[in-house]
């Protein structure tokens, strides 16, 4: 979207127009840092001026952020009751399910080792990389980190196989498969991705 590259100064010019016309701004928190939500919240206030109608669209990922529903309610209270604004949240009415193939996972961009995989263009080098012990150790460290940013919960027990040349694996998650073979869930995922590549189809939920 063009607004992705807009400066906050450009946004402020837009806000003036929207406020004058009593129009509605539909925005979204930054997918990784999320700090821009406070800027939108402040712009909605109606202290000594007309409030701007703001609605924030989010996947409301309760898996990676279990207290997110409290944050949204608190922010709404602050914006509407204390700051006299007109601030609303839009969320999905059902879990945000994404379907994936092999290593083709956009959410890998949210952490260093995953971004490295996303940047690799040579397929042979890609599969060579995920079988390096040092890389796997680094990937596991990033996946299990306590303090993370981004949308993905990084929980491979919620990675469910929907299609695979080995039909016996369909309907199982990577943690279950790892336990069967006595390996970590990440190892199970990388091993299956190496063996089946994009024929390994799986899904996970963001909310």
Which residue ranges define each predicted feature?
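Active-site neighborhoods of metal-dependent hydrolases
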Residues: 3-16, 24, 28-207
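Substrate-engagement module of ASCE P-loop NTPases
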Residues: 19
């Amino acid at each position: 979207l063009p607004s992705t590259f807009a400066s906050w100064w450009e946004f402020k010019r837009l806000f003036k127009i929207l406020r004058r016309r009593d129009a509605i701004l539909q925005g979204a928190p930054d997918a990784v840092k999320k700090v821009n939500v406070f800027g939108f919240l402040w712009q909605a206030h109606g202290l000594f001026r007309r409030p701007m109608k703001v609605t924030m669209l989010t996947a409301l990922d309760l898996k990676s952020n279990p207290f997110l529903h409290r944050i949204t309610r608190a922010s709404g209270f602050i914006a509407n009751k204390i700051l006299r604004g007109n601030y609303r949240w839009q969320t999905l009415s059902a879990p945000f399910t994404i379907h994936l193939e092999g290593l083709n996972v956009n959410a890998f961009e949210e952490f260093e080792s995953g971004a490295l995989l996303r940047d690799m263009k040579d397929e042979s080098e890609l599969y060579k990389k995920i079988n390096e012990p040092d890389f796997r150790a680094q990937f596991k460290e990033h996946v299990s980190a306590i303090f993370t940013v981004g949308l993905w919960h990084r929980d491979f027990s919620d990675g469910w196989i929907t299609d695979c040349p080995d039909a016996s694996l369909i309907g199982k998650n990577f943690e279950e498969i790892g336990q069967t073979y006595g390996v970590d869930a990440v190892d199970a995922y990388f091993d299956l991705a190496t063996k089946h590549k994009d024929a390994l189809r799986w899904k996970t939920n963001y909310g």
